[in-house]
C-alpha cells in the first residue's frame, strides 16, 4: 500500500482526494491545504473544500494548513511521514526544492500542457474558443507547470461554462491519478515542448467587465467567468444567463433591444446578437429578461442602457 500526502484546496482537488482515499491501493497519511479564510459579509472563518471533506469523513487523517512550506518544521513533518508520493492539485502554494526532493511529486493540471501553464487554464481555454481541453499528470519541478508529462486525458468543452468544465476535468483527474500512480514505474515521462508553452494569469473581478462590441467574445467571457466573477456592464448590470443567437449580424444599433420574447429578449451588439435570459442590477434581485424590461418600461428598438 503506497503512502500518499495530498496537497489541494478547492472542490476540483476534493474529487481527486476522494478517489485516492477510497482506493485500497493507497493510504492517505496527510492533507496539506490552505488556511481557513474569512468568507462573506460576516467574514465567517471557513475551511477549504478539501479540509471540510476530510475532517467530516476521515477525521483521523491529519490536516496541515501551513502559511509557508519553507518552514523547516513543516519540511521535517513531511519527511517523517515518509510518503511514496506527494500528489498536488490546485493547492495554491509553490513547493520548495526541499519538498520536491523528498518523494515523487505528481501534479494534476487542468489543461493539456504545455498549453495554459498557470492559474486559470480552464477560463483561458474557454476564452480562446478551444473546443477540446483536458487534464494531465506531471512530475513537478521548480518551474511553474514545466515538469515532464506522465499521462493525460482530453474532453470536449465546446459551449460549456467554467463550472461545468471544472466538474468534467475533476472527474477525469480522479481517474487519471489512479492510473498514473498505479502504473508509475512503467510510465516514461515526456518532456514538455517549450516552443508550444503558453501562460495564463489569475482571474480578477474586473475581468468580468464587458461591452457590447462583439457577441461571440461576450458569450465566451460569459462561459469563462461563470460562476465567478460573472459578466457585467460598466453600470453594474449583470448578465446572469444568456445565449449566442448570431455572431455576424451588424445592421442594428449597439445595445438596441431587437425583440421581446416570453421570458427573455434579443440584444444587438455592434457585431452579433445575444438572447438575454436573466439579469441583475447591482443590489437588486435577479429577474428574467422580459420582466426586467417591463420594469424599466423598455420595448423593441429602445436602447438597453
UniProtKB/Swiss-Prot annotation:
Keywords in alphabetical order: Protein biosynthesis, Transferase
Gene Ontology molecular function: any one: methionyl-tRNA formyltransferase activity
Superkingdom of origin: Bacteria
UniProt: (6S)-5,6,7,8-tetrahydrofolate binding residues: 111-114
Organism of origin: Campylobacter jejuni (strain RM1221)
Family, similarity comment: Belongs to the Fmt family.
UniProt xrefs under NCBIfam families: fmt
Catalytic activity: L-methionyl-tRNA(fMet) + (6R)-10-formyltetrahydrofolate = N-formyl-L-methionyl-tRNA(fMet) + (6S)-5,6,7,8-tetrahydrofolate + H(+)
EC number, as in UniProt: 2.1.2.9
Gene Ontology CC: cytosol
Transmembrane segments: none
Pfam families (UniProt xref): Formyl_trans_C, Formyl_trans_N
Record's keyword annotation contains Lipid metabolism: no
Protein name, entry field: Methionyl-tRNA formyltransferase
InterPro entries in the record: Fmt, Formyl_trans_C, Formyl_transf_N, Formyl_transf_N_sf, Formyl_transferase-like_C_sf, GART_AS, Met-tRNA-FMT_C, Met-tRNA-FMT_N
Disulfide bonds: none
The keyword Ion transport appears for this protein: no
The protein's role, per its UniProt record: Attaches a formyl group to the free amino group of methionyl-tRNA(fMet). The formyl group appears to play a dual role in the initiator identity of N-formylmethionyl-tRNA by promoting its recognition by IF2 and preventing the misappropriation of this tRNA by the elongation apparatus.
Amino acid at each position: 500500500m503506497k503512502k500518499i500526502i495530498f496537497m489541494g484546496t478547492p472542490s476540483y482537488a476534493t474529487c481527486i482526494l476522494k478517489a485516492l482515499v477510497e482506493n485500497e491501493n493507497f493510504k492517505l497519511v496527510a492533507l496539506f491545504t490552505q488556511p481557513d479564510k474569512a468568507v462573506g459579509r460576516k467574514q465567517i472563518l471557513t475551511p477549504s473544500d478539501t479540509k471540510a471533506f476530510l475532517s467530516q469523513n476521515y477525521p483521523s487523517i491529519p490536516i496541515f494548513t501551513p502559511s509557508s512550506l519553507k518552514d523547516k518544521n513543516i519540511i521535517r513533518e513531511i519527511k517523517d511521514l515518509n510518503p511514496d508520493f506527494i500528489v498536488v492539485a490546485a493547492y495554491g502554494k509553490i513547493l520548495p526544492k526541499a519538498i520536491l526532493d523528498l518523494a515523487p511529486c505528481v501534479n494534476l493540471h487542468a489543461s493539456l500542457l504545455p498549453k495554459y501553464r498557470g492559474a486559470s487554464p480552464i477560463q483561458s481555454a474557454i476564452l480562446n474558443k478551444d473546443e477540446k481541453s483536458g487534464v494531465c499528470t506531471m512530475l513537478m519541478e521548480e518551474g511553474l507547470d514545466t515538469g515532464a508529462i506522465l499521462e493525460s486525458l482530453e474532453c470536449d468543452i465546446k459551449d460549456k461554462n467554467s463550472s461545468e468544465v471544472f466538474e468534467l476535468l475533476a472527474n477525469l483527474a480522479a481517474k487519471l491519478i489512479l492510473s498514473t500512480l498505479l502504473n508509475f514505474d512503467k510510465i516514461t515521462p515526456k518532456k514538455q515542448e517549450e516552443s508550444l508553452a503558453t501562460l495564463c494569469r489569475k482571474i480578477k473581478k474586473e475581468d468580468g467587465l464587458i461591452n457590447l462590441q462583439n457577441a461571440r467574445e461576450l458569450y465566451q467571457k460569459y462561459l469563462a467567468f461563470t460562476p465567478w466573477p460573472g459578466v457585467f456592464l460598466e453600470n453594474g448590470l449583470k448578465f446572469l444567463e444568456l445565449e449566442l443567437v448570431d455572431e455576424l449580424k451588424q445592421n442594428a444599433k449597439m445595445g438596441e433591444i431587437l425583440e421581446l420574447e416570453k421570458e427573455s429578449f434579443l440584444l444587438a451588439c455592434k457585431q452579433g446578437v445575444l438572447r438575454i435570459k436573466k439579469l441583475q442590477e447591482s443590489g437588486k434581485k435577479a429577474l428574467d429578461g422580459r420582466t426586467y424590461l417591463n420594469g424599466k418600461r423598455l420595448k423593441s428598438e429602445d436602447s438597453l442602457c
